[in-house]
């Protein structure tokens, strides 16, 4: 009688890679005023930039309240960006479920819930961000529909086909797009919508410029070429329905931020990269087929 040797199970794959661990550690300890003071204006804490024409009159008036006016205007511009992304999520019903992937401190999830009245799951690899965002959901009285979880966007563990829509707002540069879009193709129901707003380097410029490399180093990220988004979407059943170049629309935000107390030292780099054509700020919306 022969016996079969017991099967030795493989070691479980790490939840996140060593690189992602370094990113999580950064965001677990990050307390940058540019990510906090703007959210204090109305309780919607965003981790992205703004779009639209700035109201330059905020630079006028009493000097002692000048910075307060600038911060309020910067927040208005970043809220306009969040609303623009939500505009491209398509028709969302109150009983639909959305995924805010790389949710930061949760502002985008709250925007989507306020707009559609829907269920939103926000995910981040930063336990500090998740705890902060869940506290904000409670303060806004929507924690029955908006929940934040400590998860890896490359391997979420959510059920297949469980989401009507998914978005990334300036977070795709932290992951491999081939892995990311494969996971989203699994998570989205057929006909579901994916939206990203992202910085990418311009393929026609050639390789990443000095400014793009500086931004990578500043944020511990790896900015993808524009072409990579469309290549990996095509490989993973995501068909673009809308592409909007927001590069010109984000420049006023950066010019105004450079005049505020919230400067981080990266403002001139962004402005140079946008203006020399090496860096672009895009919205891409795609349907899952």
Regions found by a protein language model. Give the residues of each.
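Conserved alpha-helix/loop element of class I SAM-dependent methyltransferases that forms part
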Residues: 55-60, 75-94
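Class I SAM-dependent methyltransferase SAM/SAH-binding core
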Residues: 97-99, 108-155
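A short acidic, Gly/Pro-enriched loop at the edge of an enzyme's catalytic core
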Residues: 154-166
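A short glycine-rich, Lys/Arg-flanked "PGG" loop and its adjoining helix->strand segment in the class I
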Residues: 178-193
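Short, glycine-/aromatic-enriched active-site segment of Class I SAM-dependent methyltransferases
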Residues: 199-220
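Short alpha-helix
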Residues: 221-237
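Conserved catalytic loop of SAM-dependent methyltransferase domains
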Residues: 242-263
